[in-house]
UniProtKB/Swiss-Prot annotation:
Protein name per Swiss-Prot or TrEMBL: Cytochrome P450 714C1
Membrane topology classification: Single-pass type III membrane protein
Transmembrane residue ranges: 7-27
Disulfide-bond pairs as recorded: none
Keywords attached to this entry: Heme, Iron, Membrane, Metal-binding, Monooxygenase, Oxidoreductase, Signal-anchor, Transmembrane, Transmembrane helix
EC number: 1.14.-.-
Positions in the Lumenal compartment: 1-6
PROSITE patterns: CYTOCHROME_P450 (PS00086)
MF-aspect GO terms: heme binding; iron ion binding; monooxygenase activity; oxidoreductase activity, acting on paired donors, with incorporation or reduction of molecular oxygen
Gene name for this UniProt entry: CYP714C1
Amino acid sequence: MEKLLALIVVLVILLSLALFYLCNILWLRAVKIRKKLRRQGIRGPKPTFLYGNTKEIKRIRQELKFSQKQGTNNFISTLFPHFLLCRETYGPVFLYSTGALEILQVSHPDMVKDIGRWTPSELGKPNYLKKSRKALFGGGLFTENGDEWAYQRKIIAPEFFMDKIKGMIQLIEDATVTVLEAWEDMIDDVGGCREIVVDDYLRNLSADVIARACFGSSFTKGEEIFCKLRQLQKVIAQQDSFVGLSALWKYLPTKSNQEIQMLDEQVRLLILDVAKEQHHYQDSHNSLVNAIIDGAQDGRSAAEAEDFIVGNCKTIYFGGHESTAVTAIWCLMLLATHSEAMEVCRGRSTLDVDALRRLKIVTMVIQETLRLYPPASVMMQEALTDVKLGNIEVPRGTIVQVPRLMLHLDKEAWGADADEFRPDRFANGVAAACRAAHMYVPFGHGPRTCIGQNLAMAELKVVLARLLTKFAFSPSPRYRHSPAFRLTIEPGFGLPLMVTKLP
């Protein structure tokens, strides 16, 4: 009897501790953060237990779902209407909740600038992202913080310096020629002009570049990896509404969680096979994968080394091709609807590194596309220690959110025509295009600026220059302008274009 009583006491204590822990992570910690910020005058909508403001956000989205005017480049009111409503109500700095997370949204220029001066050990990637996006990015450069982030960046960043990009230009050209020839054959079959849905072609092209340049293989060889990562992207994007409860949600045996686990394991095995094969050959074109494999041996166990390899390869595979592909897609959409800009862009038939630097108009088109349609809509960081942004003391554990779209469409920074496609605004560089350079952040801001931006820009220049020398583009009658958020901003119903072969 005494043993049974003792067991009951132990179970009650353990249950109490578990309940206290859950209460702390789901409510008390958020309450403490909220109180500290509200004492400093930061306001926001009142949250509810467990759900925060997520129910209200869903309601606002539903009510304003069809408020966007067709054809406009400002789609914030469609995808993120709660951002606009909260900013109008509470100002450029406000607080909202997704349950266990307190999110401080910052679009005030001075505070955005301040964010860039903090190190990744102080203001880093949120822990919830590391958990909720683990299947997509693993423990790679995208999600790591502190010393581990610095170590990974030291290994990977040199592979994307301009001297390395020079050796990738021909790879990009070869991948682009494959698309050119496919489109020419399709058009020749019908004579002169036909509708082509360009999305998959541009995604495959970008995937081919990453596969060749970073992993020494063709897209065909890595096709299964890219397809499964795309499937993961779609499933994970559907779970975003549960982000505040992600720490618990991911443990439930739901259909989507089971699909994520299955795809994650399949991608892991495929990446390890590719890495093992390419490391064996030690090919000069796949120095990145070799650098990752060598870096994984730094005092790690076999399992930790595999996690290191898989996480960073996932980051390169997905991050390296998806953002570039969707930017190329939006570039063609904007050029198709602005024929005068398309004509100005037509240029050389031979490209090298020096020629790329002289493609000023094409560069301006890419910069303007990245302003209007940045692949990632927000920058998310977590205060890993107490930090100060402007006059605001931001307590540890706060998620700091910078809405790229709102910065890029701010009329005070960009002028009254901020919603319009005007590549010439970048004629004299970013500094002259807007009031403050830190209001333009397509590749991030501060020490975590994207390491792959040189490759992305080189690829986009080659692809656009090549396509525009061969084809003219115009909108298809079937095109429906409906940007969608699926971890990246992409056309909701694809991009069908009328493609005409030039003489």
